[in-house]
């Protein structure tokens, strides 16, 4: 009535309609803005029929949201170890077959374990290694991650691959690699040498190695491919490239890796990174619970394959440092619990904070 201008839509055209309705709502709003922008009084538009707002088959109205790409609906997230903390990691399950066969062979052949190299704690002495979930040991972590990649290749289900990761179509060196090379699984030491070279040259951290393994298993699950002799180098390179950009707090450029691998081009690196992200559906999030699960599963893998961490007796100084850090965490939990309740300023001031000694 009068100068009041209204726009009527179907009852279902509400903000809860979904993201597909967004384009139509903006289109209707733009018509209103053009109508009221002039000085003359515009005629109120007619009621839009529900048939005109049919978004089911419209091709140009669908705009996928970033959250939809991060959590794909067609994947069972509870069974995907790279997304769900309760799902078992793929590399650990693939390694169990070899571990059981090795133990059975040693039992049948009466192979003695030899001199015990693992140190056990007692009442008077406690042995700890220098690796924690927040600060893993770089050398041991890279060894465990490459061992996990080795089991992925050795116990793969098939040879499903994509052209972008095929080293025969996109070689990493100018020298021609013989076809016989792609018929044999690489040894663990060869994989370790390749990954160690990248980590040493790019100065990457141990946490980046764990995230690399998370992205690798996420790629294999999302894209439904296998890591095999023809694609393992480019898949590992793409996972390291993405993990170094997401995890490490430093500027990493694709050209930096081109200086490490002399014969690869920047265009090839850019294309591989783009395909890697698209296959991950841009889900680069790694929750803390998933990261911790991969860390402890890597420790279990190291223990099963006699890749022991370097243990040392717990000294008094280190015990004090660990106690200070633990007390600091407890005080933070108390502060969070106290903030949930209403209390006076005197009680708030009375909360003590301990100084942590970081080694």
Swiss-Prot record:
Name of the protein in its database record: Cyclin-Y-like protein 1
Its Gene Ontology molecular function terms? protein kinase binding
Biological process (GO) annotations held by this record are: cell differentiation; flagellated sperm motility; nervous system development; regulation of canonical Wnt signaling pathway; regulation of protein phosphorylation; spermatogenesis
UniProt keyword annotation of Nucleotide-binding present: no
Q: Which UniProt keywords are given for this protein, alphabetically ordered? A: Cell membrane, Cyclin, Differentiation, Membrane, Neurogenesis, Phosphoprotein, Spermatogenesis
List modified residues, type Phosphoserine.
67, 105, 112, 344
Q: What does this protein do?
A: Key regulator of Wnt signaling implicated in various biological processes including male fertility, embryonic neurogenesis and cortex development. Activates the cyclin-dependent kinase CDK16, and promotes sperm maturation.
- Subunit structure of this chain's protein: Interacts with CDK16; this interaction mutually increases the stability of CDK16 and CCNYL1 and increases the kinase activity of CDK16.
Which SMART domains does its entry note? CYCLIN
One GO CC term, this protein:
plasma membrane
InterPro entries of this UniProt entry? Cyclin-like_dom, Cyclin-like_sf, Cyclin_N, Cyclin_Y
Q: Which family does it belong to?
A: Belongs to the cyclin family. Cyclin Y subfamily.
Q: Which organism is it from?
A: Homo sapiens (Human)
Q: Does the keyword Metal-binding apply?
A: no
| Cellular localization per UniProt | Cell membrane
Tell me which Gene3D superfamilies the record gives: Cyclin-like (1.10.472.10)
Q: Where is the Cyclin N-terminal domain?
A: 145-267
């Amino acid at each position: 009535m009068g100068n009041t201008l209204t726009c009527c839509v179907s009852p279902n055209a509400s903000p809860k309609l979904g993201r597909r309705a967004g384009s139509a709502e903006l289109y209707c709003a733009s018509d209103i803005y053009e109508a009221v922008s002039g000085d003359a009084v515009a005629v109120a538009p007619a009621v839009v029929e529900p048939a005109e707002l049919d978004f089911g088959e419209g091709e140009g109205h669908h705009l996928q949201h970033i959250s939809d790409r991060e959590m794909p609906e067609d994947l069972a997230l509870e069974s995907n170890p790279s997304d769900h903390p309760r799902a078992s990691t793929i590399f650990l399950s693939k390694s169990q077959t070899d571990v059981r066969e090795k133990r059975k062979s040693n039992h049948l052949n009466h192979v003695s374990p030899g001199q015990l190299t693992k140190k056990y704690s007692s009442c008077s002495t406690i042995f700890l290694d220098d690796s924690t979930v927040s600060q893993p040991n770089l050398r041991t972590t890279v060894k465990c991650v490459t061992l996990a990649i080795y089991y992925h290749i050795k116990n793969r289900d098939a040879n499903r691959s994509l052209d972008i990761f095929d080293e025969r179509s996109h070689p990493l060196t100018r020298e021609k690699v013989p076809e016989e090379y792609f018929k044999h699984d690489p040894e663990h030491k060869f994989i370790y040498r390749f990954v160690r070279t990248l980590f040493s040259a790019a100065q990457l951290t141990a946490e980046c190695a764990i995230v690399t393994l998370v992205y690798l298993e996420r790629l294999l699950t999302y894209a439904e491919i296998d890591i095999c002799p023809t694609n393992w180098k480019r898949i590992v390179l793409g996972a390291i490239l993405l993990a170094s950009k997401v995890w490490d707090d430093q500027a990493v450029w694709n050209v930096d890796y081109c200086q490490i691998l002399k014969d690869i081009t920047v265009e090839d690196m850019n294309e591989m990174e783009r395909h890697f992200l698209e296959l991950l559906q841009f889900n680069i999030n790694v929750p803390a619970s998933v990261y911790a699960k991969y860390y402890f599963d890597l420790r279990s893998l190291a223990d099963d394959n006699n890749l022991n961490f370097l243990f040392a007796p717990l000294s008094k100084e280190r015990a004090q440092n660990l106690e200070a850090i633990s007390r600091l965490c407890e005080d933070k939990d108390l502060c969070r619990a106290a903030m949930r309740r209403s209390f006076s300023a005197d009680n708030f001031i009375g909360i003590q904070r301990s100084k942590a000694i970081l080694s």
